[in-house]
Amino acid sequence: MKNIFLHSLTLENYRNFKNLELKTDNTPIILTGENGSGKTNILEAISLFYPGRGLRSSKLTDICKTSEDYCKVKTLLQSKLGLAELSTHIKRSSNRRITEYNASKIANNELSKFTNMVWLTPQMEGIFTSSSTDRRKFLDRIVYNFDTKHAALLNKYEYYMHERNKILAEDIRDNNWLKIIEEKMADISNNIANNRLKTIRFIQQAIDDIENEFPKADLSIDGIIEQKILNVEGDIVNFIITELYKTRSKDKLLGRTSFGIHKSDFLVKHQKKNILAKFCSTGEQKAILIAIILAEINSTIKLTKITPILLLDEIFVHLDDKRRQYLMGFFNALNIQLWVTATDLDGIENFANKAQLIKL
């Protein structure tokens, strides 16, 4: 088993922190303090060492401390590749972010080579009633833990889709280049769709195998390409190429690509009630989301033999005692680094006894 964890975390001009340095090890870490003390800001800073825009999906200009033009986050990480120094620098005036590994620049999508990460925030509790884009991004973040190339595939797909839209919008008469772009999109789409389906199988198996205090969920993906793969309907890549060709005129008028894996939706059902999670109560939705996160943790550890870093923002809030006790036992048994925020330790004293406490 390979344990991934932060040895240290340094923030400079990050949100409400002028300077902050934390020393940590492979144990649970509880961040306590009043609302506004910066607990979630620390989780967000850690999440920047994973592909994407962090757990808040914030604009770069919002991250730097007010009145400062730059900010920096640095960590010494026990990573998949061994001991690694990672840093990310954000400059407000140029709206740029640079990520470095041992002082050499790397692409944001390369971060999955170093870490596995899972997070849960209160904002995610509305994911079942929000847009399909949010659910798709949630699924893709799960996929990153199983396939280190998935983030790069998504970036390439976005790039080629943008190029296709540009060619159609500007009425560039270059059918050969358009054909090449659509062929690349089709090949990448096939890989992305298969990665998503494979990951859903992993998580579903983990859900079915676990007996806990949370409702079981049925996971699926609603997308034309994924459905054809599941039905084993011929040459998927050629099918995508054909559909992209057929929708050129329509997409030229729309100014966007109307067909593709960027239209798929991640669907979640309450298994016992056989209804979509979006129709469940808010309490049930939070419980279902936690069930998926627990399955993701178990599946990631079991299949990759690599432990993820967990970022859990106010996870114990509004849970009944039985579920809170179950989670504390689950986390204590993991032997991994997890970061938990809480305004106080009421109700989680047993968990706190085995954790590193950081009061802000």
From Swiss-Prot:
Gene3D superfamilies: P-loop containing nucleotide triphosphate hydrolases, RecF/RecN/SMC, N-terminal domain. Its main location: cytoplasm. Belongs to the RecF family. ATP binds at residues 33-40. Keywords: ATP-binding, Cytoplasm, DNA damage, DNA repair, DNA replication, DNA-binding, Nucleotide-binding, SOS response. Pfam families: SMC_N. It is found in: Cytoplasm. GO terms for biological process: DNA replication; DNA synthesis involved in DNA repair; double-strand break repair; SOS response. This is DNA replication and repair protein RecF. InterPro entries: DNA-binding_RecF, DNA-binding_RecF_CS, P-loop_NTPase, RecF/RecN/SMC_N, RecF_2. PANTHER family: DNA REPLICATION AND REPAIR PROTEIN RECF. One of its GO terms (cellular component) is cytoplasm. GO terms for molecular function: ATP binding; single-stranded DNA binding. The gene is recF. The keyword Nucleotide-binding applies. The RecF protein is involved in DNA metabolism; it is required for DNA replication and normal SOS inducibility. RecF binds preferentially to single-stranded, linear DNA. It also seems to bind ATP. HAMAP family: RecF.
